[in-house]
């Protein structure tokens, strides 16, 4: 199944560890986002989720620390013809395992420096590089610009600031826009999309 957490508590109306439940049990519960319940919407299998996204959006598949079988996951991505659409996010060793299976599978490393990103240059499908908000906002405000100067696509997320955006506070989003980052991850794409359109950025 497709589940970010070890439990279903945060993203469904149920409770329990994924590892201690079968899929039929998990299907008893509806999906939710914060307190918003999507009645009738169920936890998908990875195949179902990828097929729903195929040809429409890029998929950020976060498998860091989740013991996902590399060969099985790679085979599914290949079978569905989505090697150019699914971006694997994990630790370096696991990312390179995917590269050894299929160099066309997009890998999505987390980096702490431009030099970290340069170490992936031999892998053409290393396209998008994630960095922390701390890196940009405190340590190096021009980090995204430095990454772009090397030809990399810098990316970060503002998941910790979603609650602020929901009440009209866009300070964190404004700082990311100013950083010239190429991608911003959020659980509230409709809010970010509307804000970017209002500013003439989409």
Regions found by a protein language model. Name each.
Residues 57-58, 63-202:
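Short loop-to-alpha-helix "cap/lid" segments that border enzyme active sites
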Residues 1-55:
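An active-site metal/cofactor-coordinating segment within enzyme catalytic domains
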